[in-house]
Each structure stands twice: as C-alpha cells, then as structure tokens.
Amino acid sequence: AYLFLKAQGLAGKEVAYFHINATNRKAMEERNCRITHIKNENDTISFSYLSRSLPFPVDTIPRWGTKGTARDAVRQVPFMQEMNQEIMKVTDLHGNFRVTIDGTEIGRWDGNELSKGINLAEITCTPQYQQSLSIMYLNEERCAIEKRLRQYMAMQYVFFKHRGLLFADNKAALDAAKAERESHYL
C-alpha cells in the first residue's frame, strides 16, 4: 500500500501543518488547515484549528487473517514521515505545557519541543484520530457488505443462471446449491 500511495504522488503531502507564534498571537504558517481565534492570556494559549483532512489511523489489530498489524508495517517504511504528518508548531513559549483538544489532554511538552513541532497524527487520543478510526471501521464494514454482494451476484450468474434459476428464491435453487456444494465454492 505504501508503494502504491507513493506512486500516486502522495509522498510529502501533509495532513496539515501550522505554526503559531505565541507572543504575537499569529498563525505564521497554515498548510491544509485554518487557524483562528488565537489567544494568549493567563499562561494559556488557545486557538481554533480546522484541518482539511484527517490523519491515517494506524491500526494495531491484525486484520484479514494476517499475523502482523498496520503499526508493524509502518515501522518498515517511512509512511509516517512521508504521508502522515499533522504538525503543530508553537514558538515563543517557555516552560512546560499541557496540551488539550476539546478538553481532552493529548500530551505534555515543553516550549522547546513545541517549537520543533509535534506530529498530532501519532497521537491516538486526538478527536481527529478518533474520527479517522471511525471512518476506517465504517469503510471495513462497507467492504464486507460489498464482498457479500459480489459473492451473491457471482453465485447467481456463475452457478444459477445456466441452470435456469437466476434469482430464483425457491426450493429448486436451494436443492441445486446443496447438491453441488462440495464441488463448487458455494
């Protein structure tokens, strides 16, 4: 999958990148996102962040009968560095900071770490990561439904059609399927 995505020209495309200067309360750079309502008061900096895309959820559960996980796979290729970067960079901060999104703590960093940038795509408790997980699970469900429909249609046209039982919902169709289930993929 990594090589396919790279061949499609997705290497180097960020999920989002933003750089905020805390002292002058300005978004210095915004790529594939929008930063608004920047405030810096009472040792708290806050802002609104709207990304135009979601991070890729790196699944930690083996799927499709494999022993490995997507997390294992991304350790073998530079996927996170090339295609899953959602960088939050905040400069002109001193001290240690607790970072929250929608009231949920996502981590603690010092001003130096925040000035280098934090890849939010690596943090699984962010709302945007959780949203992308939901989409991933919905897509897997869609895929399973599509598979069942394809199998049903294949059975209708490959097995039942030449027997004159296309879309037959009767005992004759059931008997035909039972009679040949050992010799076919039914």
Language model: regions and residue ranges:
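Conserved catalytic region of serine esterases and O-acyltransferases that act on ester linkages
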Residues: Y2-L186
